[in-house]
């Protein structure tokens, strides 16, 4: 059920049960808050030392709230208003911890609306009775003419001109606020009334007091509503103008009343509001309406422009660093195995190094007969295969290579190769396996390996052949003896 309908029914109930409007307002606020935030009340009732209990709710409140929740479209709950203890309602309002944050602002707004409505109604009724012009005035109009300028002005404005008509003329205006207009204060331009005199107030300003400006009448209070202020009064509309609500105030300002529009124009909700509002002496201050000078034009709500946080997830490659050789070219790269091989054209090198299976990332570089294997985060172990340079029978040959990122030049020839291993304890450098050997040395070493394999194969064959010969050497006699034993 709409809140406005609840308010209307509550007002009718107030008339029926002789309650004051202030008491009805308090009841409306409690009912609306209980219906919207029932969980808060239940939680508070179970909070120790809160002093609040659902059993101590004012009489009739829970019955009405239960009926509202069960049948929100049923108006019969208003019959329960006679059971409400209104004095207890006022006491209960101040007991809850959200009184100042939720309940009090609602009460102040409703009380302000009540004060404004009653004040404006009184003013408009007094002026309406005195504003009908005398038919014997000096102005003459043709027969059957209508009075084209009549007004309802607030008590502080003076009706300067009231057009008259002869005895046959009919006064068709002298308006009061129609009941269908949803305006906080009275006096809008009456239906079918024509105001031919100068209409004061443009679409960007509002008159804070309730008045329909007659010809030459002085608008005693004008204001420019700042943003987020509540505009509670209505103001003038000139001929054939349609009074539209929410005429002034951008964004979050709440326009309670209908306000001014110039001739045949509609005041729209997007009309600009200027600062430096001027308020005359007879402006009526209405509760939370803040019409102040040099007020901020726009009430911008804090729009959370949430920063787009981009998380860049990069699949890091191997953390190893290769020993940068001359003119190095990446021959292949595999992120799965985390291994990259770079080769600088060696002397027909056939050296192959297999990285350890426990290595987290491996870089194998073969450069000019030198094989370097580097592994991250392992104990530093340097395995070096070098040539035996003791032989001087051959003419030295020039060999250039890289040893652990350092260019190495030698002028020797290798007759034999020998392997040596040295171990150092250092976790800050990479594991490096270096083979320094020229092509002649590598070829000789390869030939030695092949030779050893050949010899091993020969021994195996000889053993097999010997075993075969031994079996055959046993001869038929041994077989005959075995056969005889079996028999």
Swiss-Prot record:
<feature type="propeptide" description="Removed in mature form">
    <location>
        <begin position="466"/>
        <end position="487"/>
    </location>
</feature>
<feature type="repeat" description="2">
    <location>
        <begin position="149"/>
        <end position="160"/>
    </location>
</feature>
<dbReference type="InterPro" id="IPR050788">
    <property type="entry name" value="Yeast_SRP1/TIP1_CWP"/>
</dbReference>
<feature type="repeat" description="9">
    <location>
        <begin position="233"/>
        <end position="244"/>
    </location>
</feature>
<dbReference type="GO" id="GO:0009277">
    <property type="term" value="C:fungal-type cell wall"/>
</dbReference>
<feature type="glycosylation site" description="N-linked (GlcNAc...) asparagine">
    <location>
        <position position="404"/>
    </location>
</feature>
<feature type="glycosylation site" description="N-linked (GlcNAc...) asparagine">
    <location>
        <position position="368"/>
    </location>
</feature>
<dbReference type="GO" id="GO:0031505">
    <property type="term" value="P:fungal-type cell wall organization"/>
</dbReference>
<keyword id="KW-0472">Membrane</keyword>
<keyword id="KW-0677">Repeat</keyword>
<feature type="region of interest" description="11 X 12 AA approximate tandem repeats, Ser-rich">
    <location>
        <begin position="137"/>
        <end position="268"/>
    </location>
</feature>
<feature type="repeat" description="5">
    <location>
        <begin position="185"/>
        <end position="196"/>
    </location>
</feature>
<feature type="lipid moiety-binding region" description="GPI-anchor amidated asparagine">
    <location>
        <position position="465"/>
    </location>
</feature>
<feature type="repeat" description="10">
    <location>
        <begin position="245"/>
        <end position="256"/>
    </location>
</feature>
<feature type="repeat" description="3">
    <location>
        <begin position="161"/>
        <end position="172"/>
    </location>
</feature>
<dbReference type="GO" id="GO:0005576">
    <property type="term" value="C:extracellular region"/>
</dbReference>
<keyword id="KW-0732">Signal</keyword>
<feature type="region of interest" description="Disordered">
    <location>
        <begin position="206"/>
        <end position="299"/>
    </location>
</feature>
<comment type="function">
    <text>Component of the cell wall. Required for anaerobic growth.</text>
</comment>
<comment type="similarity">
    <text>Belongs to the SRP1/TIP1 family.</text>
</comment>
<dbReference type="GO" id="GO:0098552">
    <property type="term" value="C:side of membrane"/>
</dbReference>
<feature type="repeat" description="7">
    <location>
        <begin position="209"/>
        <end position="220"/>
    </location>
</feature>
<dbReference type="GO" id="GO:0071944">
    <property type="term" value="C:cell periphery"/>
</dbReference>
<dbReference type="GO" id="GO:0005199">
    <property type="term" value="F:structural constituent of cell wall"/>
</dbReference>
<keyword id="KW-0449">Lipoprotein</keyword>
<feature type="glycosylation site" description="N-linked (GlcNAc...) asparagine">
    <location>
        <position position="327"/>
    </location>
</feature>
<keyword id="KW-0325">Glycoprotein</keyword>
<feature type="repeat" description="6">
    <location>
        <begin position="197"/>
        <end position="208"/>
    </location>
</feature>
<keyword id="KW-0961">Cell wall biogenesis/degradation</keyword>
<dbReference type="Pfam" id="PF00660">
    <property type="entry name" value="SRP1_TIP1"/>
</dbReference>
<feature type="repeat" description="4">
    <location>
        <begin position="173"/>
        <end position="184"/>
    </location>
</feature>
<keyword id="KW-0964">Secreted</keyword>
<feature type="glycosylation site" description="N-linked (GlcNAc...) asparagine">
    <location>
        <position position="348"/>
    </location>
</feature>
<dbReference type="InterPro" id="IPR000992">
    <property type="entry name" value="SRP1_TIP1"/>
</dbReference>
<feature type="repeat" description="1">
    <location>
        <begin position="137"/>
        <end position="148"/>
    </location>
</feature>
<keyword id="KW-0134">Cell wall</keyword>
<dbReference type="GO" id="GO:0000324">
    <property type="term" value="C:fungal-type vacuole"/>
</dbReference>
<protein>
    <recommendedName>
        <fullName>Cell wall protein TIR4</fullName>
    </recommendedName>
</protein>
<keyword id="KW-0336">GPI-anchor</keyword>
<feature type="repeat" description="8">
    <location>
        <begin position="221"/>
        <end position="232"/>
    </location>
</feature>
<feature type="repeat" description="11">
    <location>
        <begin position="257"/>
        <end position="268"/>
    </location>
</feature>
<feature type="signal peptide">
    <location>
        <begin position="1"/>
        <end position="22"/>
    </location>
</feature>
